[in-house]
Amino acid sequence: MTIFASQIERKFVRPVYITRLSKFLPNDPVSNDEMEKVLGLVNGKPSKARSIVLRNNGIKTRYYAFRDGKSTHSNVELCANAIRGLFDEALPLESIDILAVGTSSPEQVIPSHGSMVHGALGINKGVELISAMGTCCSSVQALKYAQMAIASGIAESAAGCGSEKMSTWMHASRFEPEAENLTKLEENGYIAFEKDFLRWMLSDGAAAVLLQSKPNENGNSYKIEWLETISYANELETCMYAGAVKNEDGSLTGWNDLSIEDWTKQSVFSVKQDTKMLAEHIVKKGGEFLQGLMQKYNLTSDKIDYFLPHMSSEFFKKPIKENLESIGLEINNEKWFYNLPRVGNVGSASAYMMLEELMNTNKVKKGDRILVMVPESARFSYAYLYLTVV
């Protein structure tokens, strides 16, 4: 049973609404057969993992801000483009008080991703800034800051965005030194599955939301009923990481304590994932957290019209469904909505991208209730949003 920091229901001054949503997906979609043309061959060899991973993850097309060995957009540009899509002449960009962004894949360590996005937007004013660094939950963690600021009366509006630029991290050139080193050691020259696996899972894009203290006068809005996050890093060691190597005791040694030679030989800056840990814990801990939220908010299946699960792979749909049933929250297939096969796994942008498609394709009607689930495997964090269409 999850123990919450406070079992006292939070009383905010006023409700908060998601009134506009926007996404930006770079270039044309890339099919499964075209992936290695964009990402390249490591050591000149086709990936052994590619066909297995793609067969399980259910992704048919995805988007890359990368063509012919060069970037077409930076992460900052992806995020800025998605945010610009929220605004028009009737509601200018300068109307926002807060910029709340999250990403797994910034271009630089310092300054923050949010600072770079603020600069790229060309807003003719200073804004309050929150820039969350993590993986899939980072955008929602930033969103919570903005929600609380508006709810408490500190701000009137905020732009939130999740964005990812993973293609350059996944390009074959990033793994060549390690593959060449393995060949010299008379090994097979194939990089480890924990690294190659993610090359066929992650892709690029951005999605943004506008938060305001009042709903749209014309058209639908999402009212945020509640938003909860949690970390289980006190219980579980790291599962997905970059810029470090994982030691036998489960600890990490960061890039700044490794030699420059090791950075390339071990592909230290590649994204790696312990798939055994992922399978053992990611669904179970998410269900544990949700069970506590069900009790806290009296959440039952009949109070959910749409369930939006962020999944890295369709492989997890069955385990998630079984876990929900085990905690007493059976959600029928017709209530599930996700766009993973069409847009791919876009990390921190994925939750917003589902909400954007659900709203902007007119699938929802006033009164619909939506549960959004965002698991993060990095060190097992989770976010749940419960929304009502108003």
Positions of PLM-derived features:
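Condensing-enzyme catalytic core mediating Claisen C-C bond formation in acyl metabolism
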Residues: 2-72, 188-280, 375, 386-390
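Short beta-strand segments
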Residues: 20, 102, 133, 158-164, ...
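Short acidic, glycine/serine/threonine-rich loops at helix termini
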Residues: 30, 110-112, 143-144, 169-174, ...
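Claisen-condensing/thiolase-fold acyl-transfer catalytic domains that form or cleave C-C bonds
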Residues: 72, 76-80, 105-107, 119, ...
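Short glycine-rich phosphate-binding loop at a beta-alpha junction
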Residues: 94-102, 301-310
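Acyl-CoA/ACP chain-elongation machinery
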Residues: 154-176, 232-240, 313-314
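Short, flexible helix-coil linker/hinge segments at the edges of structured domains or between repeats
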Residues: 167-192
